[in-house]
Regions:
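Membrane-anchoring alpha-helices and their flanking helix-loop junctions
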Residues: 1-96, 108-168
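Solvent-exposed interhelical
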Residues: 99
Length: 168
């Protein structure tokens, strides 16, 4: 039986975030339909009540911040010559840069970007769905990656795991 040199995550993490974001958008759109309003589901389309400049500023700040964090973290993988994709083998344990503060800065960046997009869409539902999205990422991506990294890098990963928090 062949062994695989990757964590075996359930799906590419960006697709998990995108799936939940699109579900939030879709539910908000359905909630705005007249038949949904009549049936009492209009709350799905409720907005934040923020004025456009405030909403745009908050959304832009979060989106840019999340993308910058993602770029910094992913750039370390490329500079160190290892794959950023979790379905490919890891050849180096990255513990510098944003990885000094979070073991998962890319997923943290995705979450911040997602929050910005939810605000840009003016959708409470999209923001509420960030919580189950993070649960799926935590249980079916991060925990699998952690088992893989512990097996691959042994004591070095265990020491890193004890020194740096999973998210923040």
């Amino acid at each position: 039986m062949a062994t695989t040199d990757h964590p075996g995550v359930i799906a590419p993490p960006p697709l998990i975030y995108l799936g939940f974001l699109l579900a939030g958008w879709g539910l908000a759109e359905l909630g705005a339909r007249p038949e949904a309003l009549e049936a009492g589901f209009g709350w799905l389309a409720a907005d934040f009540g923020l004025e456009m400049p405030i909403r745009r500023g908050a959304a832009l700040t979060l989106i840019v911040g999340g993308l910058v964090l993602d770029g910094m973290a992913a750039g370390l993988f490329r500079r160190r010559g290892t794959a950023v994709e979790p379905w490919k083998p890891s050849t180096v344990l990255i513990i510098e840069g944003p990885y000094r503060f979070s073991r998962n800065p890319i997923y943290l960046g995705f979450a911040v970007t997602y929050a910005g997009l939810g605000i840009a869409m003016d959708s409470w539902v999209a923001l509420i769905l960030l919580a189950p999205c993070l649960l799926v990422v935590d249980r079916f991506v991060i925990q699998r990656e952690e088992r893989y990294l512990a097996a691959k890098f042994g004591g070095a990963y265990d020491a890193y795991r004890q020194a740096v928090r999973r998210w923040l």
